[in-house]
């Protein structure tokens, strides 16, 4: 059973549309079987239960029209007569309501009066539980809190070491005070010797503990760094194809490289400076005991540091954003240039490319220089505040000593203590650029880590694929505002059948196979394998059982054997050789000195196009997939290489469902059935000879063009 927009159960239609909006796959047949037992359509209660089963959080409320603009949209307006509709958007200024008429399968704008006439006060708010969890688990600075809790024992050890370091930092000025006020005045050489030995011991302990703290801290932050790096790469590979298609490679690489900024921040002095700053309250208490006036001068300088940082930060952030954007442009241009080096040399456009690079590089250097200048101004401002405070303390301290309110030893001890307080403040102020930079890095990295991965319900325990394929009422477009690529496509393929798909460029041939690999979920309709809706299937389970050979296949910079056995590195050599023979690759591999251990070079640069293609076919066959897709796999080959592959095609296709997409009609003429597509629709299908008999058909026209 396929739920389309002509279904009598508008509740089920609405549920499907809302589920698709929240990127949640839905099996209409399963929902109807579980929750529409009487076959009369979903009731309000059963609708809410069905939504809950899909991990949707649905809440039925009564809401006045005047307060509808406060709710999250889209939402379902529930009608007692079953004429439900979706409320998509509200224009409060013009008092217009954008709705979606489920009966007519079309958007509709209602005036205030029209909406009031059909609104009964009942509305169902729908949100995705997964999206709520995703927002709670959003990658930002709070992500590091669980990591800190996880390694709390190590951080507690670091805190304990920091306490001892601060105690030693407190003792040292006291020793100097005793020397100045007692030893020098009374000429106490024995006391001087004792204090010197004690001070030496304190210094040794301070050095050892400081090194130990740095080691412990670096060790724990390195673990967090490894966890973040591993999570980033796993998440990157789990992102849908659409994420990469909508972004330049250089942009993605630039965002991943932001991990270096976070790493430098975690292992740098910034966090230890924060720990030192936390102990400043103890120092302030001792300093207040020495001289409240001098302490107030120090306290008065702290807002100056803060205000200066607040003034600099927004400007610095804007300049860092500009620097990142220009750096990402450079990264993207560099990747593009290296990838297209053959074209650049063939067309002799190196001067033009160099000119573009020089302009972009100059722009990046200029933005980087502006960041450096502003950071320098910020640091000099901090130095100015520090020097001003030092002069004021010197002048005021000297007055206090002269007036007898403070001894020379106390003044020296106070200055040493104030140095211990101000040092972490100055370091933090000077490292404010790092704080700002790491904040931007976290945001940039969040663009990757907060992007949703490929989703599936994972509730179906699916067996091994047999090979039956069905496309039912498929409608698809790559973006909501993009033109329709596939429109009302219906196609059934029996297991073991060899299907050829032909048509003009842009007719939707490759898109059909992308839906079969679940790179995308159709806007409407179902893609079924052995009767199972692929929207409910684990993408990895599916793709492991489908072999795909494209026109331009990518080989990794590894040996031929490793490329063929990519999905299962421990695969036996017998399986690798069998797949290579089936693909017609064994003979040329045997002729190479290193044989299957030959390194193919980056993207297979050490091999010819035909050799790369045959290795790609072997890689697709080595797992014995029940479904095999050849997407223009032979269109770029010379006739000899194509002949070798076509000779083995009967063996390759044996026991498999095979889909051949080709512009060359000679590639598909022996197929069991040929599908002809035009503008996203199937316009013809049949065997080669049958299609040729239709002189007015597209296939006959394409065949005549190729003959001529």
Swiss-Prot record:
<dbReference type="InterPro" id="IPR005074">
    <property type="entry name" value="Peptidase_C39"/>
</dbReference>
<comment type="function">
    <text>Part of the ABC transporter complex LktBD involved in leukotoxin export. Transmembrane domains (TMD) form a pore in the inner membrane and the ATP-binding domain (NBD) is responsible for energy generation.</text>
</comment>
<feature type="transmembrane region" description="Helical">
    <location>
        <begin position="296"/>
        <end position="316"/>
    </location>
</feature>
<feature type="transmembrane region" description="Helical">
    <location>
        <begin position="159"/>
        <end position="179"/>
    </location>
</feature>
<comment type="similarity">
    <text>Belongs to the ABC transporter superfamily. Protein-1 exporter (TC 3.A.1.109) family.</text>
</comment>
<dbReference type="InterPro" id="IPR036640">
    <property type="entry name" value="ABC1_TM_sf"/>
</dbReference>
<keyword id="KW-0997">Cell inner membrane</keyword>
<keyword id="KW-1003">Cell membrane</keyword>
<dbReference type="InterPro" id="IPR039421">
    <property type="entry name" value="Type_1_exporter"/>
</dbReference>
<feature type="transmembrane region" description="Helical">
    <location>
        <begin position="389"/>
        <end position="409"/>
    </location>
</feature>
<dbReference type="GO" id="GO:0030253">
    <property type="term" value="P:protein secretion by the type I secretion system"/>
</dbReference>
<comment type="subunit">
    <text>Homodimer.</text>
</comment>
<feature type="domain" description="ABC transporter">
    <location>
        <begin position="469"/>
        <end position="704"/>
    </location>
</feature>
<dbReference type="GO" id="GO:0016887">
    <property type="term" value="F:ATP hydrolysis activity"/>
</dbReference>
<dbReference type="InterPro" id="IPR011527">
    <property type="entry name" value="ABC1_TM_dom"/>
</dbReference>
<dbReference type="GO" id="GO:0005524">
    <property type="term" value="F:ATP binding"/>
</dbReference>
<feature type="transmembrane region" description="Helical">
    <location>
        <begin position="192"/>
        <end position="212"/>
    </location>
</feature>
<dbReference type="InterPro" id="IPR017871">
    <property type="entry name" value="ABC_transporter-like_CS"/>
</dbReference>
<dbReference type="GO" id="GO:0140359">
    <property type="term" value="F:ABC-type transporter activity"/>
</dbReference>
<keyword id="KW-0067">ATP-binding</keyword>
<keyword id="KW-0472">Membrane</keyword>
<keyword id="KW-0813">Transport</keyword>
<dbReference type="Pfam" id="PF00005">
    <property type="entry name" value="ABC_tran"/>
</dbReference>
<dbReference type="InterPro" id="IPR003593">
    <property type="entry name" value="AAA+_ATPase"/>
</dbReference>
<dbReference type="InterPro" id="IPR010132">
    <property type="entry name" value="ATPase_T1SS_HlyB"/>
</dbReference>
<feature type="transmembrane region" description="Helical">
    <location>
        <begin position="270"/>
        <end position="290"/>
    </location>
</feature>
<dbReference type="Pfam" id="PF00664">
    <property type="entry name" value="ABC_membrane"/>
</dbReference>
<dbReference type="Pfam" id="PF03412">
    <property type="entry name" value="Peptidase_C39"/>
</dbReference>
<feature type="binding site">
    <location>
        <begin position="503"/>
        <end position="510"/>
    </location>
    <ligand>
        <name>ATP</name>
    </ligand>
</feature>
<keyword id="KW-0812">Transmembrane</keyword>
<dbReference type="InterPro" id="IPR039395">
    <property type="entry name" value="Peptidase_C39-like_A"/>
</dbReference>
<dbReference type="InterPro" id="IPR027417">
    <property type="entry name" value="P-loop_NTPase"/>
</dbReference>
<dbReference type="GO" id="GO:0030256">
    <property type="term" value="C:type I protein secretion system complex"/>
</dbReference>
<keyword id="KW-1278">Translocase</keyword>
<dbReference type="GO" id="GO:0005886">
    <property type="term" value="C:plasma membrane"/>
</dbReference>
<protein>
    <recommendedName>
        <fullName>Leukotoxin translocation ATP-binding protein LktB</fullName>
        <ecNumber>7.4.2.5</ecNumber>
    </recommendedName>
</protein>
<keyword id="KW-1133">Transmembrane helix</keyword>
<keyword id="KW-0547">Nucleotide-binding</keyword>
<feature type="domain" description="Peptidase C39">
    <location>
        <begin position="1"/>
        <end position="126"/>
    </location>
</feature>
<feature type="domain" description="ABC transmembrane type-1">
    <location>
        <begin position="155"/>
        <end position="437"/>
    </location>
</feature>
<dbReference type="InterPro" id="IPR003439">
    <property type="entry name" value="ABC_transporter-like_ATP-bd"/>
</dbReference>
<dbReference type="GO" id="GO:0006508">
    <property type="term" value="P:proteolysis"/>
</dbReference>
């Amino acid at each position: 059973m396929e739920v389309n927009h002509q279904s009598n159960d508008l509740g089920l239609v609405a549920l499907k549309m809302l589920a698709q909006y929240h990127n949640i796959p839905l099996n209409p047949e399963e929902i109807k079987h579980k929750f529409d037992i009487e076959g009369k359509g979903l009731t309000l209660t059963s609708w809410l239960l069905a939504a809950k089963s899909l991990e949707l959080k649905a809440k039925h409320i009564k809401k006045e029209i005047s307060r509808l603009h406060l709710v999250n949209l889209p939402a379902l307006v529930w009608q007692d007569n079953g004429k439900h509709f979706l409320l998509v958007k509200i224009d409060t200024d013009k008092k217009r309501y954008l709705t979606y008429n489920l009966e007519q399968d079309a958007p509709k704008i209602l005036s205030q009066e029209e909406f009031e006439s059909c609104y009964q006060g009942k509305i169902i708010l729908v949100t995705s539980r997964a999206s709520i969890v995703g927002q709670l688990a959003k990658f930002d600075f709070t992500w590091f809190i669980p990591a800190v809790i996880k390694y709390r024992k190590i951080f507690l050890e670091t805190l304990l070491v920091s306490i001892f370091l601060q105690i030693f930092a407190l003792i040292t000025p006291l020793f100097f005070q005793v020397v100045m006020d007692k030893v020098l005045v009374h000429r106490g050489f024995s006391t001087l010797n004792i204090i010197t030995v004690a001070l030496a011991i304190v210094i040794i302990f301070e050095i050892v503990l400081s090194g130990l703290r740095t080691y412990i801290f670096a060790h724990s932050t390195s673990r967090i760094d490894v966890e973040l790096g591993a999570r980033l790469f796993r998440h990157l590979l789990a992102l849908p194809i659409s994420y990469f298609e909508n972004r330049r490679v250089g942009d993605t690489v630039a965002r991943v490289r932001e991990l270096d900024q976070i790493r430098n921040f975690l292992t740098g002095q910034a966090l230890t400076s924060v720990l030192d700053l936390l102990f400043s309250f103890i120092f302030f208490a001792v300093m207040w005991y020495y001289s409240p006036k001098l302490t107030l001068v120090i306290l008065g300088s702290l807002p100056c540091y803060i205000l200066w940082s607040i003034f600099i930060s927004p400007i610095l952030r804007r300049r860092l954003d500009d620097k990142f954007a220009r750096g990402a442009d450079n990264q993207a241009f560099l990747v593009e240039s290296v990838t297209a080096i053959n074209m650049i040399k063939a067309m002799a456009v190196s001067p033009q490319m160099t000119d573009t690079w020089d302009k972009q590089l100059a722009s990046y250097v200029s933005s980087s220089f502006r960041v450096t200048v502003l950071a320098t101004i910020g640091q000099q401002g901090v130095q100015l505040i520090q020097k001003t405070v030092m002069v004021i303390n010197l002048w005021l301290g000297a007055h206090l000593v002269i007036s007898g309110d403070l001894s020379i030893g106390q003044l020296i001890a106070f200055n040493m203590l104030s140095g211990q307080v101000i040092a972490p403040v100055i370091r933090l102020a000077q490292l404010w650029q790092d704080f700002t930079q790491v904040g931007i890095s976290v945001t940039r990295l969040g663009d990757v880590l907060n992007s949703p991965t490929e989703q599936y319900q994972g509730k179906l325990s699916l067996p091994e694929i047999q090979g039956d394929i069905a496309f039912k009422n498929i409608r698809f477009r790559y973006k909501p505002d993009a033109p329709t690529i596939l429109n009302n496509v219906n196609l059934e393929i029996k297991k073991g059948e060899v299907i050829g798909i032909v048509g003009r460029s842009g007719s939707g041939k490759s898109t059909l196979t992308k839906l079969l690999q679940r790179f995308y979920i159709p806007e409407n309709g179902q893609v079924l394998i052995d009767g199972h809706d692929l929207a409910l299937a684990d993408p990895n389970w599916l793709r492991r059982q489908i072999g795909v050979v494209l026109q331009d296949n990518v080989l990794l910079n590894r040996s031929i054997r490793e490329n063929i056995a990519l999905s299962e590195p421990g695969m036996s050599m017998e399986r690798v050789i069998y797949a290579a023979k089936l693909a017609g690759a064994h003979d040329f591999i045997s002729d190479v000195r290193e044989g299957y251990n030959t390194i193919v070079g980056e993207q297979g640069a050490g091999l010819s196009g035909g050799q790369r293609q045959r290795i790609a076919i072997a890689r697709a066959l080595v797992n014995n997939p029940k479904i095999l897709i050849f997407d223009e796999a032979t269109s770029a080959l010379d006739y000899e290489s194509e002949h070798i592959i076509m000779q083995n095609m009967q063996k390759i296709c044996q026991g498999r469902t095979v889909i051949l997409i080709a512009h060359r009609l000679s590639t598909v003429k022996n197929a069991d059935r040929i599908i002809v597509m035009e503008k996203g629709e199937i316009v013809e299908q049949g065997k080669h000879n049958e299609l040729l008999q239709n002189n007015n058909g597209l296939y006959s026209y394409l065949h005549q063009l190729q003959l001529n």
